[in-house]
């Protein structure tokens, strides 16, 4: 039995080198974690559900209750708790970043280890958006920090990550032009021209469509507008293979990149600042 496991691990390691796209897909689907194998770091213990929840749980008990409501996908409870905190005078942006976001972050990390599934992410995302809408309404009109076009690249219909990025950008004072999913390079460039956007954020969940991000970054270069790239199919090594682009691992990275670009820094400077 042990010999069979050793052979399986050897085959998996060979796959990592020879078929990185297939390896990445298996990692994303939680198959490796399900086997109890951590191939990123042989000395690292497999993260548990409790570790993830404890790491992301807000220290403030009221904020922790909001995060838990998001994790459970409980729209009514999320709205109730956020409304009460806003009435107490809590800052809307602080609520988004430190009460709502920890909830969705937890669900996404649980998904990464095979302890959460797409329906649960969808429910948590809906609860998150209900809370964000309340915070945006309370915050009202504020001076825009800049314009960001947000999209999922052509060929990909998965927009949960894009929606989260758009929500957190709006919560931080950016005007977001949301083009939706399955967006062509031509449509994205046209949107940049018509809106005079400062930045484009592009995501993809599938390795088969990530080449579209490279094409988009190249097409945006003559416009002087960089592309912030993210999503399950994308990593820093891939984004570093082409210019006019910055890799963001988390939604908060998108905010950092947007701030750098809207302050007048180049994509190279933004990339160096983030890395």
From Swiss-Prot:
InterPro entries: Cbl-bd_cap, Cobalamin-bd, Cobalamin-bd_sf, Met_Synthase/Corrinoid, Meth_synthase_dom
Entry's Gene Ontology cellular component terms: cytosol
One family name in Pfam for this protein: B12-binding_2
Residue span, B12-binding domain: 145-272
Cystine bridges: none
Family: Belongs to the methylamine corrinoid protein family.
Protein name: Methylated-thiol--corrinoid protein MtsB
Organism: Methanosarcina barkeri
